[in-house]
Regions:
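Polar/charged alpha-helical tracts
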Residues: 26-29, 46, 87-88, 139, ...
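Post-HEXXH active-site segment of zinc metalloproteases
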Residues: 111, 122-166, 172
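Short helix-to-loop capping/linker segments positioned immediately adjacent to catalytic or ligand/cofactor-binding
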Residues: 35-37, 101, 108, 162-165
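Generic hydrophobic secondary-structure packing signal
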Residues: 24-27, 110, 170-173
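A generic helix-loop boundary/linker signal
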Residues: 18-21, 164, 168
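A metal-dependent hydrolase signature that marks the N-terminal structural subdomain at the beginning
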Residues: 1-84
Length: 173
């Protein structure tokens, strides 16, 4: 089980701070170096699936990866994958990818898993920090609702570089 350790420029809420494409490429190269030897041509689906934890900008959290079950959005539509944070599990992010089948080829599954791991690297640290905050000095002691987060990859168009692709939406529950 692999734990990726990565750092990038971020704000005090642990969200990326003006990261350029070249910096994302450097971060991806650092992740690749931690997952496979230089002699390996490509990172495999299994290597990505075995990532069990992330340490991003000093924030440690577990990563649960599921590739066994079909994934659906809130409306019940089949989607390729999601990256989620549930405040009931404050030290973990979850990545779920629909299994290879009619609508998802092996290559699309690999691309979707890498894409959702990108959300785990760049979005989840902020979610974990936000989820760990308790009430402030002047807040009510009564339990308050905590926010869950989800990013969704609905289809292959979302993974394309085309300008027509819809941007990722972050959903709050």
């Amino acid at each position: 089980m692999a734990v990726l350790t990565l750092d990038y420029r971020c704000c005090d809420r642990k969200r990326p701070l003006y990261i350029k494409h070249i910096e994302v490429e450097r971060i991806a190269a650092t992740a690749r170096q931690q997952l496979v030897a230089d002699s390996i041509d490509a990172v495999s689906f299994d290597a990505l699936r075995q990532i069990s934890g992330l340490k991003i900008n000093g924030i440690d959290f577990a990563l649960e990866v599921s590739t066994d079950y079909a994934v659906h959005d809130e409306q019940g539509n089949h989607v390729f994958g999601v990256c989620e944070f549930d405040p009931a599990m404050p030290d973990a992010a979850m990545v779920s990818i629909s299994p290879v089948g009619e609508s998802l080829s092996e290559l699309l599954a690999l691309s979707t898993l890498a894409h959702e791991l990108g959300h785990a690297v760049f979005d989840a640290p902020g979610w974990v920090v936000q989820g760990s905050k308790g009430p402030g000095l002047f807040d009510d002691i009564e339990p308050t609702m905590q926010r869950a987060y989800r990013t969704t990859t609905p289809d292959s168009e979302h993974l394309s570089k085309a300008l027509s692709a819809k941007p990722t939406t972050e959903e709050h529950f």
